[in-house]
Amino acid sequence: MKIGIYGGSFNPIHFGHIGLAKWVIAHTDLDEVWLMVSPNNPLKDSSILEDEQVRLQKAKEAIAQLPSSTPYTLHPTPTCAERIIVSDFEFHLPRPSYTANTLRELHNHYPQHEFTLMIGEDNIAIFTQWREYQYILDNYRIFIYPRRGCAPYQLPMGKDLQVLTNAPY
């Protein structure tokens, strides 16, 4: 199964997050998008974050409100609500949360899946500050989605980078 890892604080989750996840499901080859609620981001001030369990619960509630039924067909397909999964996977990893570590552990726990990292284009400017960024570039496909107000950027060299130019932002 092809799974998009959409990490973030989700402080709070909002229509933009959900809209992007739905768009990626509809317009790429991903089977699922996992909203990876991060307990803390080493590049952000964690003192302004709502409690991690509260953020996780709000994300679950937001996804649960998506339509969960599809019209009857001979070959039913999963709905968006069934293909967007809210995950607390990072809650069970050493802190702070580093994306490379999360991806490595996901691969160890779910070797049958192919993971794609989803990041906003605002992260490209600071990507080389990420711990083990080269490991991520060398081993994972990366979807880069647009962010309002971002300055032009140069893409890092990596295994498989795809800019989602038509994705909502």
Where do the PLM segments sit?
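Nucleotidyltransferase catalytic core that binds NTPs
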Residues: M1-Y169
